[in-house]
Amino acid sequence: MNKLRVIGNDLVKYYEIDLTDYLPLTSKAFRIIDKTGKQYFVKETLPNTLEKYQFLYNQGLTNILYPLKNFEQKFVTRNPLASFYVSNFYDDTTIISEPKAQHMLNELDNLHEKTSFKRQLNPMTSRPKFEELTNRLDYKFKMLENYIRSVEAKPLNMYSMPVLANYQYVLDAKKELVRLQKRIISSIKAKDSIDYSFVHNNPRLEHTINYNGSYYLISLDNGKIGVESLDFAKFYIENENLNLDFKNIFINHFKGLNPFYYDYFRYLVLLIYISRLDVASDEYINAEIFISTTNSIKKYFTNFQDVNEDDE
């Protein structure tokens, strides 16, 4: 209730909402009820969320459920202690996840297409980012290698056997990341012209809802200007266990486009998987996370091999 106390006066001042009851949904989001019984969704956010929603509104995006405008005609209310927005509360009940996932992909496509603009890849800004990623990956792979060596030096048991058996997929991911990074850097050096757009950056299924028979995107607080591959990589990882033909979905999507998009998509998927493997020391790793992650990497190689491309 502390956060609601901070914004409670502003709910009255900027929205004429007199709070009578609430239900926490997350640490920053609440379902609230006013004195008339009407329900709202209130979420604490960052101050720059205002500019994001205003940008999308000005671009004419109609597949977004925007927050309610306050009395200053702004989507986000900002004060020295907190920034927040208010939306009508929509009770979205989804029985089958697969159709909803497909609808979200459609709405992400719509978002990217309507905010798209051309920009050349810039070696000056991209090189430091990839050098940082390379250093992080090198450190992570070194820690994993040391950990596996420590496991091999001990007697086999029910814990160590599946870890050792699945380590090959980590090595496969390492080789693939090097190969993809080489290709991405080639695109950067060539200063390829790439479509940038507004990416949702948190494309979880609960961030699309069905309202009056149409699907809308919500919770774009983390959105930013970037390459669509980021949204698709995060979407795939969030939903990889659904019964969807991801192989054909993404091959068909990237077919005919600059190979950079598909390379970057695959690079990000593997990067996120490897980042999951938190090696606390040479002696310990969470076996359950290791097995599930390496199984995901194995599935990656089934879904996302090169198509009509020469292996490098």
Where would I find each of the regions flagged by the language model?
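A glycine-centered beta->alpha junction motif in the catalytic cores
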Residues: A82-S97, E145-A153, Y273-I291
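ATP-dependent phospho-/nucleotidyl transfer catalytic cores
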Residues: M124-F198, I249, N303
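ATP-binding pocket architecture of kinase catalytic cores
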Residues: K35-T125
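ATP-binding glycine-rich phosphate-binding loop
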Residues: R5-K35, N70
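Regulatory N- and C-terminal appendages and interdomain linkers associated
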Residues: M1-D18, P47, Q168, K175, ...
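Active-site acidic catalytic loop and adjacent metal/ATP-binding pocket
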Residues: A29, P67, R179-F232
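Active-site activation/catalytic loop segments of kinase-like enzymes and analogous catalytic loops
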Residues: E228-P259, I272-Y300
